[in-house]
Amino acid sequence: MPTIQQLVRKGRTPKVTKTKAPALKANPQQRGVCTRVYTTTPKKPNSALRKVARVKLSNGTEVTAYIPGEGHNLQEHSMVLVRGGRVKDLPGVRYKIVRGALDTQAVKNRKQARSRYGAKMEKK
């Protein structure tokens, strides 16, 4: 427990929280270009072929981003919008690609949770 005089001299330093998406440089999203689109396998209890893309962001950093939803139209040189948000069973994947923005198409035939996948309302 510091004395009042010690607090007057030094003061208390606030805890610095480390950002979970450092490549975005404190922005909500960042634009980037796909350099490689491929599939990876998840960590131990799960089994699948997860679709990921290596993206070079407009600020110069290169990140691995997950492509959510069923099916995608991404290939090399596609312009994508990247947001934060990790994929728990893919080590090193701390970003997600925004569906329905720039060159990324929305998920087709999506009925629920449409806004997450850029899907428009189905016409009756």
Swiss-Prot record:
Transmembrane segments: none annotated. Keywords: Ribonucleoprotein, Ribosomal protein, RNA-binding, rRNA-binding, tRNA-binding. It holds the Pfam family Ribosom_S12_S23. Residues 9-18 have a biased composition (Basic residues). InterPro entries: NA-bd_OB-fold (IPR012340), Ribosomal_uS12 (IPR006032), Ribosomal_uS12_bac (IPR005679). One of its GO terms (cellular component) is small ribosomal subunit. Residues 1-30 are annotated as: Disordered. GO terms for molecular function: rRNA binding; structural constituent of ribosome; tRNA binding. It comes from the Bacteria. With S4 and S5 plays an important role in translational accuracy. Interacts with and stabilizes bases of the 16S rRNA that are involved in tRNA selection in the A site and with the mRNA backbone. Located at the interface of the 30S and 50S subunits, it traverses the body of the 30S subunit contacting proteins on the other side and probably holding the rRNA structure together. The combined cluster of proteins S8, S12 and S17 appears to hold together the shoulder and platform of the 30S subunit. Part of the 30S ribosomal subunit. Contacts proteins S8 and S17. May interact with IF1 in the 30S initiation complex. PANTHER family: 30S RIBOSOMAL PROTEIN S12 FAMILY MEMBER (PTHR11652). This is Small ribosomal subunit protein uS12. It comes from Leifsonia xyli subsp. xyli (strain CTCB07). The gene is rpsL.
